C-alpha cells in the first residue's frame, strides 16, 4: 500500500482534503496529513516513510529529500514550483510535478480586483478612472495570462501580450495583440500584468529600465512571484516617478520601503491568488490524480524536472 503525505503549512480547505483522501482511498493508498506545521523538523519526520507527497507553497529542498527515503513523487498543487529544488529532486530520483491551470481563473480574477482598487485610488474617496479602453499588457500567455485576457475583454480593454515561448499566432488567435518583446509590451501598455515564473532567466528581470517604459499613470500588477522584481530599482523608480503604481499579492522583501509610497502601492498580507475554495479543491484533487497516475501507470505529463 502506497503512503501519501499532504504537507501544507498553509492548509487546503476541508472540502479539498476530503476530495484528495477520496482519490487515495479509491486507489487503496494511506493518507497522512501534516497541516500548519511550524518547524521544518516536523516535515522531516513526516516524510521519512512516504511514497508520495502533495505540497502547496511548502519548500522541498535537499534536506527534505534526504529525509524522504522512500519518496518517488512530489506534486505542487499549483502552477509555480520554485519552492521545489528540482536538481535535488532529480538527484534523489524523485519526480516533481505541478498542476498547471487549476488556479488560473482564481489568480486572474484577483488581478482585476487589484486593478479596480488601484484605478479607484485605493478607495480613498477621490475620483478614479475606469478600466474600459485602457491597454492591458500581459507578460506570459499561459493559463493565467489567457484567463486575464478573457476577463479583460469583459471590461472592454485593449489587450496585448508577450510570451517568449508562445507563438504569436496562438496569442493572436485568442483575440489578443502579440508584441515582439517585453520592452514593447511595457511601451504600449497602460497596465502590465506579470505572469512569468521565477527562473534563472526571469529573476529581477522586471527592472527600472523596463518599468520606466510605462506611460504616465502606468500600473504594474504582480500576481506571479516576488523574485521577478528588482525591488531596489523599482523603489528608485517609484521615488522618481510619482505617477506610477505597483499592486501585488506577494509582499516584497522591502515592504516597509514600498509602504512609504502611500496611495501608489498595495500588497495583500499573504499570497492570495489561489486562495479561493474552487482553486483549492481543483489543485488538490488534480495533484492526487497525478500521483495515482504516476504510481499506477508511470504517467509523467506534468513533470517539471528531468
Q: Which residue stretches match the model-derived regions?
A:
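Phosphate-coordination loops involved in phosphoryl transfer and adenosine-cofactor binding
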Residues: 1, 71, 132-135, 208, ...
